[in-house]
């Protein structure tokens, strides 16, 4: 967090995460960019926890501008769901967490 704030201070610009999100798998916060764990069951609590941690860490900072959710699909009705272990928050409990933070801040 200190390093990110330092970049904001150095350039006198707010920080915007152009992409953020976590898979709904065990240890979703460990190397979250890796997507090679396809044969694992969904862990919706892990996705909730990692997403909440991101919001709690950055969302209230005045130097933070927000971010864009990875991975949001245009076909909402058929995307995600509680058995889906991929990045999308659609039709999963984490979607409500995201809505709450975007509404509040």
Question: Model-flagged regions — what are they?
Answer:
Residues 27-39, 44-53, 57-105:
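Aromatic-rich peripheral "rim/lid" segments of glycoside hydrolase catalytic domains that contact
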Residues 1-35:
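Noncatalytic carbohydrate-binding groove/subsite architecture in carbohydrate-active enzymes
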């Amino acid at each position: 967090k200190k390093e990110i704030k330092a970049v904001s201070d150095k350039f006198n610009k707010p920080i915007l995460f152009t992409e953020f999100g976590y898979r709904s798998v065990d240890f979703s916060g460990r190397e979250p960019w890796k997507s090679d764990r396809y044969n694992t069951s969904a862990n919706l609590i892990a996705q909730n926890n990692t997403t909440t941690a991101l919001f709690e860490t950055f969302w209230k900072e005045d130097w933070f501008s927000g971010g864009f959710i990875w991975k949001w699909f245009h076909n909402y009705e058929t995307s995600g769901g509680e058995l889906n272990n991929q990045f999308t928050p659609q039709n999963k409990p984490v979607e409500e967490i995201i809505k709450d933070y975007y509404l509040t801040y």
